[in-house]
Amino acid sequence: MKRLITLILVSLAIPPIYAGGAVDTPFLNSGPYVGLHGGVALPSGSDLNAGPVVGAQVGYRMGNVRIEGALSYYSNSLEANSDAKLRMTTLMANGYYDFNFNAPLVPFVGVGVGWVHAWRTNNGVLLNRGPDNNEFAYQGIAGVSFRVSPRVTLGVDYRYLGWTDGNGSQNLIEMSVNYQF
């Protein structure tokens, strides 16, 4: 966990070092993009350990506004039994607003709504899965992005992911890379 936090802090520190070589084209060009994201999921108030989150997104930028669809996978082990896991898949529709200050770093905020499907395993054996494991999901997002080239953007963000059954939520720290067409 300490290594992940160190990696995130170093990643945030590197972009300003290279800001002098930043692209001179406008940051907020309109058009479609695709990307990958990954990070750590920190469960809120539960008996679960932190675990990985990975996923992909496809979206469209219109000036300061972005709309995207994202598919993510989460895996958290139980504190009492590391062989028992809670696994989740989410499919989210996200909307973002990018604050363009004509600077290399662009802060953004966003919200998302979608679907979460959760299931439990123990030693790889499926314990429960079915239609009762589907819930409405929602998230709030805040982060910062950096344009590496005219088409590539790196980002770091925090997300609060919740779902309607009221039995839990996740705090997510993620890094992303997007390629704009």
Curated annotation (Swiss-Prot):
Q: Which Pfam families match?
A: OMP_b-brl
Predominant cellular place of this UniProt entry's protein: membrane
- What InterPro entries does the database record attribute to this sequence? OM_autotransptr_brl_dom, OMP/PagP_b-brl, OMP_b-brl
Its localization reads: Cell outer membrane
Signal peptide positions (record): 1-19
Entry keyword set:
Cell outer membrane, Membrane, Signal, Transmembrane, Transmembrane beta strand
**GO CC annotation terms, alphabetical:** cell outer membrane
Q: Does the keyword tRNA-binding apply?
A: no
- Which NCBIfam families does the entry link to? autotrans_barl
Entry's family note: Belongs to the opacity porin family.
Q: Output this protein's name.
A: Uncharacterized protein CBU_1600
Source species, please?
Answer: Coxiella burnetii (strain RSA 493 / Nine Mile phase I)
